[in-house]
A protein has these predicted regions:
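N-terminal flexible segment immediately upstream of the FAD-binding catalytic core
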Residues: 1-63, 79-110, 160
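A generic structural-conservation signal
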Residues: 24-25, 74, 136
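Aromatic/hydrophobic pocket-lining residues that form π-stacking "cages" and hydrophobic walls in ligand
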Residues: 61, 68, 123
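Residue-level detector of anion-binding/catalytic polar loops
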Residues: 70-71, 133
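Short, ordered loop/turn segments at secondary-structure junctions
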Residues: 76-79, 139
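FAD-binding subdomain of flavoenzyme oxidoreductases
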Residues: 101-108, 112-190
Length: 190
C-alpha cells in the first residue's frame, strides 16, 4: 500500500491544481460515488471525485491518472445496476454531471449533439417543443454518457432500437488521454 500511496497523492495533487474546488475527497461524496442503485455489489468509494466541465478537462484528468497508474471510474448519475460505479481499487471517480449541455439540435436531420452528462429527461425536456424525443428509456433517468457506456436499451427498443442504433458518433477520451471522434452525421444506409 505504501508504494501506491505516493503516486496517488501526486496524482491527486496534480488534479487539485487543474480543477481546484472541483476535486473533492469528502467522505460523503466519495461514498455516494462508490455506490450504484443495485444492492448486489459492496459499495467501494474512490480516493477522490473530480467534476470536469469539458472534454479537454476529461482528457487532462485521464492523462494525469494514466501517468500515475491511478484507476479511473466514470460516473453519470449513479443509476448503474451492474456495479459500474464501484471503485474496487480506489482511484478517481470522474463525475460528468457538469458536462450537461445540449450542444445543438438538427430538427431536419432528426439528430442532436449532447455532452455526456445530459440526462434522458433533460434531453426530452429540451426537445419537447420540436416534436422530437429521445426514445431510449432504460427505466432510470440515466445520462447519455452512461447509457452509451452500457449500451442501454429499454421498453422502446423493439420500435426504436437500442442506444447503438440511435448514436451517429461519439467523442471519446482514450485511456491515455487522447481525444478521438468516431462516426459522423451521415447515417449508414447499406
Amino acid at each position: 500500500m505504501a508504494t501506491q500511496s505516493l503516486p496517488r497523492e501526486n496524482a491527486i495533487g496534480e488534479l487539485s491544481q487543474l480543477l481546484g474546488d472541483r476535486l473533492t475527497a469528502s467522505v460523503a461524496v466519495r461514498e455516494q460515488h462508490g455506490n450504484g442503485e443495485c444492492g448486489l455489489y459492496t459499495p467501494q468509494p474512490p480516493d477522490a471525485v473530480v467534476f470536469p466541465r469539458s472534454t479537454e478537462e476529461v482528457s487532462a484528468i485521464v492523462s494525469i491518472c494514466a501517468a500515475h497508474a491511478m484507476p479511473m471510474v466514470p460516473y453519470g448519475v449513479g443509476t448503474s445496476v451492474e456495479g459500474n460505479v464501484t471503485a474496487p481499487y480506489g482511484g478517481v471517480c470522474i463525475d460528468l454531471s457538469q458536462m450537461n449541455e445540449v450542444v445543438c439540435v438538427n430538427e431536419a436531420d432528426l439528430d442532436c449533439t449532447v455532452q455526456a452528462g445530459v440526462t434522458r429527461k433533460q434531453l426530452n425536456q429540451y426537445l419537447k417543443d420540436t416534436g422530437l424525443f429521445f426514445p431510449i428509456d432504460p427505466g432510470a433517468d440515466a445520462t447519455l454518457g452512461g447509457m452509451a457506456a452500457t449500451r442501454a436499451s429499454g421498453t422502446n427498443a423493439v420500435r426504436y432500437g437500442t442506444l447503438r442504433e440511435n448514436v451517429l458518433g461519439l467523442t471519446v477520451v482514450l485511456p491515455d488521454g487522447k481525444i478521438i471522434k468516431t462516426g459522423g452525421r451521415a447515417r449508414k444506409s447499406s
